[in-house]
């Protein structure tokens, strides 16, 4: 296939992993994510890429900050809401609902190795620590 074509809503809602890379192109990557009640992505910044996230199911909050040590803004999120996080902006998405939060993310350029599947946040954290030597 010359690109990815599919029902992104179905792919997102059917996902039962913390993070799965669905497709990686030369300049963009599509991932689907599930955060359990109370779970969060974690405070992070991507210095080299922009990130788009869209909520398909659930409620959440996003924190945004100019630096690692300060949250400058917090915004509520719900179904069909989206976030664009520019390169270098610190951010965290937190599931504030009682059920799963289902979302998808576009990274430009790609962030994760093609084919990445992290069943849980703990698995994702361990992989990141190994990759970055923490």
What are these regions (language model features)?
Residues 78-79, 87-113:
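Ligand-binding loop in jelly-roll beta-barrel domains
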Residues 67-87:
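Short acidic-glycine-tyrosine-enriched beta hairpin
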Residues 32, 62-64, 103:
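Short hydrophobic/aromatic-rich beta-strand segments that constitute the beta-sheet cores
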Residues 48-61, 65-67:
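Glycine- and acidic-residue-biased ligand/ion/polar-headgroup-sensing regions
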């Amino acid at each position: 296939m010359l690109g990815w074509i599919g029902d992104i809503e179905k792919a997102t809602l059917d996902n039962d992993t913390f993070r799965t890379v669905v497709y990686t192109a030369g300049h963009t990557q599509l991932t689907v994510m599930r955060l359990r009640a109370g779970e969060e992505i974690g405070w992070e910044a991507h210095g080299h890429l922009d990130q788009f996230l869209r909520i398909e199911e659930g409620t959440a909050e996003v924190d945004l900050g100019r630096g690692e040590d300060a949250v400058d803004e917090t915004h509520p999120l719900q179904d069909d809401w989206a976030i664009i996080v520019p390169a270098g902006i610190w951010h965290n998405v937190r599931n504030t609902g009682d059920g799963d939060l289902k979302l998808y993310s576009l990274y430009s350029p790609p962030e994760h190795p093609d084919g990445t599947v992290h069943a849980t946040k703990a698995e994702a954290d361990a992989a990141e620590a190994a990759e970055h030597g923490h």
